[in-house]
A protein has these predicted regions:
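Conserved C-terminal guanine-recognition region of P-loop GTPase G domains, centered on the G4
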Residues: 51-58, 74-151, 182-186, 209-228, ...
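Conserved beta-strand elements of the Class I
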Residues: 13, 94, 193-195, 300-302, ...
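C-terminal effector/interaction modules appended to NTPase cores
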Residues: 17-23, 207-399
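Short, flexible loop segments at the rims of nucleotide/cofactor-binding pockets, characterized by
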Residues: 39, 68-74, 98-105, 173-175, ...
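Canonical P-loop GTPase G-domain recognition
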Residues: 123-126, 131-186, 193-195, 224-226, ...
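G-domain G4 guanine-recognition motif of GTPases
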Residues: 65, 95-100, 125-139, 152-161, ...
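Long, well-ordered amphipathic alpha-helical subdomains in the mid-to-C-terminal portions
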Residues: 187-213
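Conserved G1/Walker A P-loop phosphate-binding module
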Residues: 1-76, 80, 84-86
Length: 399
């Protein structure tokens, strides 16, 4: 369960004002206390998340966030972190303290709901009125008539019927979300054979495969596709021994070497390109790679990785790609590096973004980066497409 990659989990994000009961509901959904719960407003500062298995649906990621009405300079930073999680979500659960529904005019509440739905148009929503134990029955009945689209709960209730109702609603909403494209869609089908080329160099972890390789192997097994794995040093021999290869999938670092060995009759792609197809906009990435030729002296290129790792002399992002770009263009290009979920606020400083394969990212994470690039009129591509272009196999590879 907990080994399902974060990038393959649907993201459920709990939002609302401070002291609306987000953390209590978060803990109830998980079945144990993960977030600190307090009557003091602003207890949750940074987003808190936990991977979980939702019975009846599957692997999810549930996120508790700071209040959207947090105040002060630090409060503004907390709200920004909450909004980052909201952008990356599949389902937003907006929690109101029911006293707000009593004390604030319905027109204002409805405008708030309309505004947030307009801001996050591609998300599913659930609206909750919490702390119904604070109201007498007559006032509660009136509020329920006015807000029929809400789920009304009290987390203090000894009966957890509300929790079952909420779980069912979450599953219903998640089933409405976009299904991610299969990693191998349009590339391979049942009964085909894939040959995976996995170089073992200083960056290869000892005793295990890296996540993209594992995910591709699993995708092949799920779809009844036979898998052969070899190192680049044994590729020629492996091809001679196996005459029915339908697709070769290689690590991008050895794209050119592999392209020289694999016959033109066999399709060739990379692990990173397959993730670009699944997670992002492959046409945008292809267009972005062509922009490399237009880079000028002094241009800044942002290289974005979704996770952190120690850097070796063979590192793709920090060493290989910058060196190849300088060699290809002959220009004095400046490179900056960013890790994790956030991009810099001042993207206008850059000429283009080169994104990692994104095996740890959801499609929402990746597409938010594509949207940010478009908003700032920047080219964007990913490691695999970039290396195909720089190593002279751009037209040979399949996308």
């Amino acid at each position: 369960m907990n080994n399902t990659p974060i990038g393959n989990r649907k993201s459920i994000v709990l939002v609302g004002n401070r002291n609306a009961g987000k953390s209590t509901i978060f803990n109830k959904l998980l079945g144990f206390d993960r977030s600190i719960v307090s009557s003091v407003a602003g207890t949750t500062t940074d987003p808190v998340w936990k991977a979980s298995e939702m019975i009846g649906y599957g692997a999810v990621r549930i996120v508790d966030t700071a209040g959207l009405d947090d105040i002060g300079k630090l409060g503004a930073q907390r709200v920004a972190k909450s909004e980052e999680e909201m952008r990356d979500s599949d389902l937003l659960i907006y929690i109101f303290n029911i006293e707000d529904l009593v004390n604030i005019e319905e027109e204002i509440i409805r405008k708030k709901i309309k505004d947030i739905k307009n801001k996050y148009k591609d998300k599913e929503f659930i609206f909750i009125a919490n702390k119904i134990d604070l109201l007498d029955e007559k006032i509660l009945d009136d509020i329920k008539l006015r807000y029929k689209d809400f789920i009304f709960i009290s987390t203090k209730s000894k009966e957890n019927a509300w929790l079952e109702n909420l779980n069912n609603k979450i599953i219903e909403k998640l089933k409405n979300t976009e299904e991610e494209k299969s990693l191998l869609e349009g590339m391979l089908s049942y009964g085909d054979t894939a040959l995976l080329v996995v170089p073992i160099d200083s960056e290869a972890p000892k005793g295990r495969l890296i996540l993209p390789q594992v995910q591709i192997i699993r995708a092949c097994l799920d779809e009844g596709i036979k898998v052969i794995v070899c190192r680049d040093s044994e590729l020629e021999e492996t091809l001679k021994e196996n005459k029915n290869i339908d697709l070769v999938i290689t690590d991008s670092k050895v794209f050119d070497k592999v392209a020289d060995i694999v016959p033109e009759s066999i399709s060739l792609t990379s692990f990173s390109i397959l993730f670009a197809r699944e997670k992002g906009d492959i046409e945008e990435f292809l267009k972005g790679a062509r922009y490399l030729e237009r880079l000028k002296d002094g241009d800044k290129v942002l290289i974005a990785e979704s996770c952190t790792h120690t850097v070796s002399h063979e590192d793709i992002g920090q060493v290989l790609i910058p060196n190849l770009i300088r060699k290809k263009t002959g220009k004095k290009i400046e490179f900056e590096f960013v890790y994790g979920k956030s991009l810099p606020d001042d993207l206008e400083r850059f000429s283009m973004i080169i994104q990692c394969g994104g095996c740890m990212m959801t499609r929402n994470n990746m597409m938010n980066r594509v949207y940010a690039a478009r908003e700032h009129n920047l080219a964007i591509t990913n490691y695999g497409v970039t290396l195909a272009y720089l190593k002279g196999v751009f037209d040979r590879a399949v996308y």
